[in-house]
């Protein structure tokens, strides 16, 4: 916010609001975003926040659509009351000092991992902050289901105050919008790798703003052939590998790009592993034309 001699210049506020009107709001409003800077911070693991997340979990688990999205089911399980209490015990400070949130957190979620935005939001809420989260611009089914569950939970009278602490937004790449949201922030969380970080760094943040970035990184898997052949849950291993790799079309940083085999019976283990994975891929994986184009572009 620009000031001159201690007086706020309203022209800049007006320009900022015009930029905010370009945004599509899934939860929240332009006025709500402007008001976030004045919201009081909360203590970590605020009871109302915990209750809200548990309510979202219940709604998701009762939604039949969730059965086809293992990542949404994982999220619903993660935010249930029992797990939040476990996280709370891990977070508890031994010195008994009072902890408070820092303020307004601006999250830029990755475009290729549908549910990441929700995990980032939950961490922001549980640490006592108000949150503006840019969700993927692509219309993922998982995003729709989670947003609808949150909207439903926020309609309950006991959780309406949480509404002020959440803005889920969608907009195409726009540096002016990034500028407005960044200069409001007390925390900026950038997912999406090196190129996203480089672009967001063109948008200045306040001197006291904390920035958390997730740069490019790659994963590999190491499989002990002898141990693998000795376990009964080979179908479960194939399912987990599929979820980590094919579910995000190998775009997530946790998706293995290399598999290293160890042990004496490597060839036998490879044959069993790949056959089970092939059966699963044939049943579940849809190779869309846009995926082929993206892979070809990356290869070139």
Where do the PLM segments sit?
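Conserved small-residue-rich beta-alpha loop and adjacent elements
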Residues: 88-153
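Residue-level signal for short, function-critical loop segments
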Residues: 111, 137, 226, 263-264
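Glycine-rich nucleotide phosphate-binding loop and flanking beta-alpha elements
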Residues: 112-113, 195-197, 267
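Conserved NAD(P)+-binding/catalytic subdomain of aldehyde/semialdehyde dehydrogenases
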Residues: 159-258, 263
């Amino acid at each position: 916010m620009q000031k001159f001699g201690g007086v706020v210049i309203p022209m800049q506020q007006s320009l900022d609001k015009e930029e905010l009107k370009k945004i599509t709001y899934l939860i929240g409003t332009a006025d709500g975003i402007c008001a976030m800077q004045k919201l009081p911070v909360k203590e970590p693991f605020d009871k109302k926040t915990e209750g809200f997340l548990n309510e979202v979990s219940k709604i998701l688990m009762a939604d039949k659509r969730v059965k086809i999205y293992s990542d949404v089911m994982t999220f619903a399980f993660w935010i249930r009351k029992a797990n939040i209490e476990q996280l709370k015990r891990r977070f508890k400070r031994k010195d008994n000092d009072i902890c408070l949130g820092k303020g307004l957190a601006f999250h830029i979620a990755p475009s290729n991992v549908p549910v990441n935005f929700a995990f980032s939001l939950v961490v922001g809420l549980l640490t006592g902050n108000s949150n503006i989260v840019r969700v993927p611009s692509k219309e993922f089914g998982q995003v729709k289901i989670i947003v609808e569950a949150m909207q439903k939970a926020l309609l309950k009278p006991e959780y309406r105050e949480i509404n002020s602490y959440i803005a889920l937004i969608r907009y195409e790449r726009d540096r002016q919008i990034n500028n407005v949201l960044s200069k409001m922030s007390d925390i900026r969380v950038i997912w999406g790798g090196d190129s996203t970080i480089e672009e967001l760094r063109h948008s200045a943040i306040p001197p006291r703003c904390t920035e958390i970035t997730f740069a490019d990184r790659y994963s590999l898997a190491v499989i002990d052939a002898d141990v693998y052949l000795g376990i009964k849950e080979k179908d479960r291993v194939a399912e987990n590998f599929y979820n980590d790799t094919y579910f995000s079309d190998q775009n997530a940083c946790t998706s293995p790009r290399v598999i290293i085999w160890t042990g004496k019976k490597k060839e036998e283990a490879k044959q069993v592993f790949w056959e089970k994975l092939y059966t699963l891929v044939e049943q579940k994986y849809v190779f869309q034309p846009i995926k082929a184009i993206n892979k070809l572009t990356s290869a070139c």
